[in-house]
Amino acid sequence: MDWGGLHTILGGVNKHSTSIGKIWLTVLFIFRIMILVVAAKEVWGDEQADFVCNTLQPGCKNVCYDHYFPISHIRLWALQLIFVSTPALLVAMHVAYYRHEKKRKFIRGEIKTEFKDIEEIKKQKVRIEGSLWWTYTGSIFFRVIFEAAFMYVFYVMYDGFAMQRLVKCNAWPCPNTVDCFVSRPTEKTVFTVFMIAVSGICILLNVTELCYLLIRFCSGKSKKPV
């Protein structure tokens, strides 16, 4: 996956975000994507190869691994980051459309602006108001939903956030209940708890930003003359 391309796109959104939104993007890339790319892949790189069961029955080890780890932590984290980042891309599309319309009207002479050329329009910071306010606020709301949903999926799918050292499996074609051992359970538990904690921090930042936008919206409404 091209995380650099995603950073470039979201970096464009970052120019029009609130201060809280800028902090969220920093946390997203430094504490989640960088950890996922640099460290987590090393920890989970050997997960299936080093998943050992005390049986020689063909297929038993693979079935047991699939039963306890239906989706790799790495892939689920990557999927989570995609879902969490997608709403921000909607904001980028909205800003791009806004600038396109403004450039079109500028070229046709339909609007009078303080800008001398199109390049200045491209560099303009778009204020979070009007229809963009709804797009931006909606993107934050869906980020919170996706973060919470994936945290719940993690907890249910893996029966908690701690990685077990020993799991017992009696799925077919295992001849009986076999013991299977997970490699690096403590290290994987630490990484899992860290990623979940960062998800919680991101939810807190998103809720704080959402409250800030709602308060600013309501205060703006109250200042308008009746």
From Swiss-Prot:
Between which residues do disulfide bridges form? Answer: C53-C180, C60-C174, C64-C169
Q: What is this protein called?
A: Gap junction beta-2 protein
Q: Which residues lie on this side of the membrane: Cytoplasmic?
A: 1-20, 99-131, 216-226
Belongs to which family?
A: Belongs to the connexin family.
Give the record's subunit note: A connexon is composed of a hexamer of connexins. Interacts with CNST.
Where does this polypeptide localize? Cell membrane; Cell junction, Gap junction
The portions of this protein that span the membrane are 21-40, 76-98, 132-154, 193-215
Record-level GO BP terms = cell-cell signaling; gap junction assembly; gap junction-mediated intercellular transport; sensory perception of sound
> Which organism does this record belong to?
Bos taurus
Would the keyword Zinc be found if you checked this record's keyword annotation?
no
